[in-house]
Curated annotation (Swiss-Prot):
Disulfide bond positions: none
Binding site for Zn(2+): 124, 127, 149, 151
GO molecular function list: histone deacetylase activity, NAD-dependent; NAD+ binding; zinc ion binding
Function text: NAD-dependent protein deacetylase which modulates the activities of several enzymes which are inactive in their acetylated form. Deacetylates the N-terminal lysine residue of Alba, the major archaeal chromatin protein and that, in turn, increases Alba's DNA binding affinity, thereby repressing transcription.
Enzyme superclass (EC): transferase
Organism for this UniProt entry: Sulfurisphaera tokodaii (strain DSM 16993 / JCM 10545 / NBRC 100140 / 7)
Gene: cobB
Keyword terms, alphabetized: Cytoplasm, Metal-binding, NAD, Transcription, Transcription regulation, Transferase, Zinc
Name of this protein: NAD-dependent protein deacetylase
Length: 250
């Protein structure tokens, strides 16, 4: 079984990391971006550009507040909890994520590097005062759109919009160069520079395991490709590792 193979690779790895995309959160009720039912099938990606935010902050927030409310009702699924458990076991050193939903942290993962920010945080573009997103949504309900800081500046979500550089890419690539195994989970692996993370691990001689519903451009260089539902597959990996650990200690 692929589950056993992945478990064995994790057990023999000395520095394994996870790289996650929107596909890990679909079982939590959050749509991915580019899949058959993805967000960009329903909305124009232009709504998530820095140019649109600057041109029409009110229109931008009409879209983003709906997205925020959808994210805030979501809870971690079994895949998030499985990764948190693998981290507690010492088998996953870090999670590098493209996601902005904060579900890895809610599931208990501690070393999470967010490339695209976190929708649960906001800040003023003028004075840089920070806000939690619940406060901003309350402000919208009371004062209308766009939400404004006490200084008069427009508040924006602390996420990377199209047209902006990603966060933490240098530290993420540094981790990737150290890793000897990467689990690429729920990502189309088409977005640059984030897709350099799994590619870097492979180029440095590490193993690449891809868990994704759709084909990716890196499938042909992966050591293992899994098409199963990640919220079912990852708990299976955890159970296998526990059984092996129990067997070895008895």
């Amino acid at each position: 079984m692929e589950c056993d193979k992945v478990g064995d690779l994790l057990l023999t790895s000395t520095y394994a990391i996870a790289f996650t995309g929107a596909g890990i959160s679909t079982a939590s009720g959050i749509p991915d971006f580019r899949g058959p039912n993805g967000l960009w099938k329903k909305y124009s990606p232009e709504l998530a550009t820095i140019e649109y935010f600057k041109k029409d902050p009110k229109g931008f927030w009409e879209f983003y507040r709906l997205r925020m409310r959808g994210l805030f009702t979501a809870l971690p699924n079994r895949a998030h909890y499985a990764l948190a458990e693998l981290e507690k076991m010492g088998l996953i050193r870090a999670i590098i994520t493209q996601n902005i939903d904060g579900l890895h942290q809610l599931a208990g993962s501690r070393n999470v590097i967010e490339l695209h920010g976190n929708m649960r945080k906001c800040y003023c573009v003028n004075c840089l005062k920070t806000y939690d997103s619940d406060t901003v949504l309350d402000k919208i309900d009371k004062e209308g759109l766009p939400p404004k800081c006490e200084c008069g500046g427009v508040i924006r979500p602390d996420v990377v919009l199209f047209g902006e550089p990603v966060y933490n890419i240098s530290s993420a690539l540094e981790i990737a160069r150290e890793a000897d195994l990467v689990l690429a989970i729920g990502s189309s692996l088409t977005v640059y520079p984030a897709n350099m993370i799994p590619l870097t691990v492979k180029e440095m001689g590490g193993k690449l395991i891809i868990l994704n519903a759709e084909e990716t451009p890196l499938d042909n260089i992966a050591d293992i490709v899994v098409r199963e539902r990640v919220e079912e597959f990852l708990p299976c990996v955890v159970d296998y590792i526990k059984s092996q650990t129990l067997h070895r200690s008895s």
